[in-house]
């Protein structure tokens, strides 16, 4: 804990439980995530469960900053690692399978892809982004095996707890499916990171707070809080043109994220609290490209409030006793 910072899971001015802090505590040194494109598709695009994909999702399957899909995984990894090494000379790496749905393949395909990068020098773990409806038993069994011998996260896209919004964004699974996916993974002790998005069409502050509260009540170990950013070429552009989407202001976003941080468990690891997209594809909100300004504003607001992650968190058993 840093002097004048009451939050226990921090050794800087940050008043929330950053992934960087967690990884340093776990491994004892700096660890970087290397975002890869494993060449997968998505069941919400290829017709397995639906067509068209989530309306906010880019042509890169939300992997706009991942490696080049046309390169093999080893080439992708080394290209990104070498760029990172120019700035940070020391550190280890987590292979992050980010683009599309990274369990949407037979187990033997998953094994070939995941094991190839885990065998690389300085790779200490793997993070796998997927959908809760893409966790058949044999895949979960393989993930459980991975979890026994390496550092593993499975990242699941919830986005919102509200079924009306889920239909509007064509998520193509319901909240119960999400809960079942979490439970399948947690049965094997696998770390789960929930993704939520602030600023989805027709959602107000209370709805976004309800999504954060739902995540707080789940047995998940991490959360990514994204800002919705609208990209050219996505289906959501049509919703925007029809007036179904208004961008959050920077101040509203900062206030909202601080409110959300206050109600999630202090031990929950915050993998992200903002987001941006490729500048050449961005329609808005354009303030989001100033990521460091947004991060600074969030921490400043928490400081001004005398607050921190988990200040108002109540566990379900505590609530039921009230």
Swiss-Prot record:
Whether Iron counts among this entry's keywords is: yes
In terms of InterPro entries, this protein maps to:
ELP3 (IPR039661), Elp3/MiaA/NifB-like_rSAM (IPR006638), Radical_SAM_C (IPR032432), rSAM (IPR007197), rSAM_horseshoe (IPR023404), YhcC-like (IPR005911)
Family of the protein in this entry: Belongs to the radical SAM superfamily.
State the free-text cofactor note.
Answer: Binds 1 [4Fe-4S] cluster. The cluster is coordinated with 3 cysteines and an exchangeable S-adenosyl-L-methionine.
Q: Which domain of life is it from?
A: Bacteria
Which annotated residues bind [4Fe-4S] cluster?
42, 54, 57
Q: Which keywords are on file for this protein?
A: 4Fe-4S, Iron, Iron-sulfur, Metal-binding, S-adenosyl-L-methionine
Q: Which PANTHER family match?
A: HISTONE ACETYLTRANSFERASE-RELATED, PROTEIN YHCC
**Matching SMART domains:** Elp3 (SM00729)
Question: Which cofactors does this gene product need?
Answer: [4Fe-4S] cluster
Q: What is this protein called?
A: Uncharacterized protein YtqA
